[in-house]
């Protein structure tokens, strides 16, 4: 089903692009299913025809048959008419290599026929140079689509790719209405994602290039931006520095490779590659097991409700929640109401289990009022920053890390409601749709940022956002991700912004290693250093690269929006090519460090494990409604998962405080504690925390005497509804 209920649901123009994107995603998915079913049904005919053709062609290979007799011999095996029928059948059934089930997409024309006029007549599209052809087609359809014409022979044809041509232009050379419409929508979807076509006046779907530093603003800030990013104004100086780093690192790694037992050079395949042995799990010494057990035994049991109130007593995070329209509005016991609302959202249980009619701070009216007026992205972010900053002051957290290192990973949530802010992925969501909560965790175990992503979009689009948009006191400069977050463009952007990108690549040894000096001799690494970078691209775009990086650093443009616009599906711009070029060099520096330094690989793995373990705590907290997110709109999803991050941070902070107290207690008891053991402790435990509430087995005296409970008043019933 299309993930929207009708045009009446839309609150404005910004809703159209995501609806279009979601609709086409469903159409493409269904087209693939239909095409695969068709192929299965025709497989026997295709196999039979292929075998017949193979037999016919085998006569061509018989040396003993004279050339002039081949046709007669073939036709003696398969009559001419039969062979012609087989060839026709194969051409009908077999799919070309560039086929993307477009024929099945055209069959679903009826699903877009009613939607398209609303889109074309309501949204004002504009374009960058790369989107002019799409915009021309859009203007044409906005004029002609209301007509009943079956053929659009005067339509702009530049958008018709080779894979679409046979479905758009029929045998009589007419441009069909159905084929052209679906071809256009496919092109429009791609152009909107890349922002080659954009929505005029929209923040989310507008032109990111227009928001970059430019003109007098750029000239006034140019030198300041160069200095803040730590790059020279002369591109040759930057290239010389990169070349020296890369050359010296190649030589250092090559000199030590024969001593590196974890890495082998494999030349048996078509291309040489490195084989990297997996890291062995770290042994857990008896002293660490004993320390973990002693601390676990000392941690007092606590209800999650009390934990939130206790953390508020330490940090005052509830003070960050202020009334949406009356900043000075405060009521008695507001922290209690806020804690209840936070728990309702984070645990995914709703307000009902927390309502107490005899407690003023927990009445139905108070909790609904608190949720409506105090819970929003702004206040959640500020409250979370208080917890993260408090965690950073604790001695135990400082042993774990200094806050300079972080990891990014996604948690998947099924969304069993109709919403445009969700996407399909059978691996994670089965037959449902879902969202990804892409969150960032510091080496002190605190979560400092989170992004809600429809479905499972490429992580690489969002990985920089957590560093640039987070509002805590931490200053992470290095980030670890899984393979999905890695791309050469991201490596380039990280370097331009002064950050270190350290992903865990699934097959690092098979990656392309790039060199800057074509003639350099890197010994045993010569065979894998087969990529040749082109520094000229960097020189030509150097000032533009710094302008782009400076705009990101100053928050002029959102990272994910810009990355989408840079990732052209066809013919990347000169700027994109230059960033990718510098990314290749920095990716190679990373790869050389990765294969050479086991401690580096271990550090990446350790930080990623922290993020995954933190997800387990968040799952335990978000236990209601099968852990499914049932908010329909983006704001609601972001607020709920932001609340989950806040409550998870409260659990981590509470555990850290009490673990520190337990360590102090053990020292006072004369225990000798090993610093290395303390560094390997984790605050990501939750067995001592009651998140499920308490159950009462007492009855009111009236009921024990056989009387019924009083019925609700009408006003109460309306409030519940």
Language model regions located:
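Long amphipathic alpha-helical coiled-coil/heptad-repeat bundle
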Residues: 1-244
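Short, charged/polar micro-motifs that form catalytic or ligand-binding hotspots
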Residues: 9, 13, 76-79, 102-105, ...
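Short amphipathic alpha-helical coiled-coil/interface segments
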Residues: 246, 371-375, 582
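Structured, charged N-terminal subsegments at the starts of enzyme catalytic cores
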Residues: 248-357
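Active-site cores of enzymes that catalyze phosphoryl transfer or operate on phosphate-rich substrates
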Residues: 310, 314, 318-320, 330, ...
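Long, positively charged leader/targeting segments at protein N-termini
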Residues: 338, 373-377, 413
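Catalytic or ion-translocation cores adjacent to nucleophile or general acid/base/metal-coordination motifs
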Residues: 355-394, 425-543
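Long, compositionally biased intrinsically disordered regions
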Residues: 520, 527-721
């Amino acid at each position: 089903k299309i993930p929207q209920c009708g045009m009446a649901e839309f609150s404005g123009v910004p809703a159209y692009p995501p609806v279009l994107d979601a609709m086409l995603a469903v159409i493409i998915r269904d087209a693939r299913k239909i095409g695969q079913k068709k192929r299965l049904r025709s497989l026997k005919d295709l196999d039979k025809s292929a075998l017949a053709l193979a037999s016919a062609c085998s006569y061509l290979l018989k040396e003993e048959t004279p050339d002039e007799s081949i046709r007669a011999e073939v036709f003696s095996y398969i009559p001419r008419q039969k062979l012609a029928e087989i060839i026709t059948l194969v051409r009908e059934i077999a799919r070309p290599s560039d086929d993307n089930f477009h024929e099945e997409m055209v069959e679903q024309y009826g699903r877009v026929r009613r939607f398209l006029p609303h889109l074309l007549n309501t949204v004002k599209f504009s374009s960058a140079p790369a989107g002019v052809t799409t915009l021309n087609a859009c203007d044409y359809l906005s004029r002609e689509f209301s007509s009943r014409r079956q053929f659009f022979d005067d339509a702009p044809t530049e958008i018709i790719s080779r894979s679409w041509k046979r479905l758009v232009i029929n045998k009589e050379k007419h441009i069909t209405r159905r084929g052209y419409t679906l071809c256009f929508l496919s092109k429009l979807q791609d152009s909107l994602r890349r922002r080659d076509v954009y929505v005029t006046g929209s923040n989310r779907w507008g032109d990111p290039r227009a928001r970059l530093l430019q003109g007098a603003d750029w000239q006034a800030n140019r030198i300041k931006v160069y200095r803040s990013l730590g790059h020279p104004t002369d591109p040759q100086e930057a290239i010389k520095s990169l070349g020296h780093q890369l050359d010296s690192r190649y030589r250092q790694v090559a000199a030590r490779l024969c001593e590196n037992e974890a890495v082998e050079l494999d030349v048996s395949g078509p291309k040489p590659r490195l084989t990297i042995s997996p890291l062995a799990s770290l042994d857990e010494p008896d002293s660490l097991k004993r320390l973990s057990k002693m601390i676990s035994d000392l941690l007092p049991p606590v209800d999650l409700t009390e934990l939130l109130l206790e953390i508020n007593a330490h940090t005052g995070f509830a003070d960050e929640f202020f009334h949406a329209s009356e900043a000075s509005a405060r009521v008695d016991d507001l922290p209690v109401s806020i804690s209840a609302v936070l728990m309702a959202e984070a645990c995914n249980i709703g307000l009902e289990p927390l309502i107490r009619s005899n407690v003023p701070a927990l009445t139905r009216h108070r909790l609904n009022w608190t949720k409506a007026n105090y819970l929003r992205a702004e206040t959640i972010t500020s409250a979370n920053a208080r917890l993260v900053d408090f965690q950073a002051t604790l001695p135990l957290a400082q042993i774990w890390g200094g806050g300079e290192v972080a990891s990014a990973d996604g948690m998947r949530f099924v969304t069993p409601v109709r919403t445009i802010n969700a996407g399909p992925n059978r691996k994670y969501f089965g037959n449902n749709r879902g969202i990804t909560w892409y969150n960032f965790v510091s080496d002190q175990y605190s979560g400092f940022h989170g992004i809600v992503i429809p479905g499972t979009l490429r992580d690489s689009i969002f990985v920089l956002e957590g560093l640039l948009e987070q509002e805590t006191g931490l200053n992470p400069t290095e980030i670890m991700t899984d393979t999905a977050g890695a791309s050469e463009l991201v490596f380039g952007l990280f370097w331009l912004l002064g950050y270190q990108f350290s992903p865990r690549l699934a097959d690092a040894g098979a990656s392309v290693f790039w060199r800057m000096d074509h003639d350099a001799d890197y010994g045993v690494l010569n065979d894998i250093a087969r990529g040749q970078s082109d520094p000229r691209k960097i020189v030509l775009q150097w000032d533009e690269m710094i302008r782009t990086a400076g705009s990101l650093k100053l928050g002029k443009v959102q990272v994910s929006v810009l990355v989408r616009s840079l990732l052209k599906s066809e013919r990347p711009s000169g700027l994109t090519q230059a960033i990718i070029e510098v990314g290749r060099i920095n990716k190679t520096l990373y790869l050389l460090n990765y294969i050479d330094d086991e401690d580096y690989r271990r550090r990446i793995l350790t930080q990623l494990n922290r993020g995954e373990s933190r997800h387990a705590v968040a799952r335990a907290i978000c236990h209601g409604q099968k852990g499914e997110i049932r908010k329909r709109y983006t704001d609601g999803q972001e607020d709920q998962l932001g609340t989950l991050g806040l409550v998870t941070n409260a659990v981590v902070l509470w555990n850290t405080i009490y673990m520190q107290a337990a360590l102090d207690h053990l020292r006072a008891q004369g225990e000798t504690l090993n610093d290395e053991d303390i560094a390997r402790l984790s605050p990501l435990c939750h067995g001592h925390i009651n998140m499920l509430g308490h159950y009462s087995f007492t009855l009111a005296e009236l009921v024990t005497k056989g009387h019924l409970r009083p019925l609700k008043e009408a006003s109460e019933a309306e409030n519940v509804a």
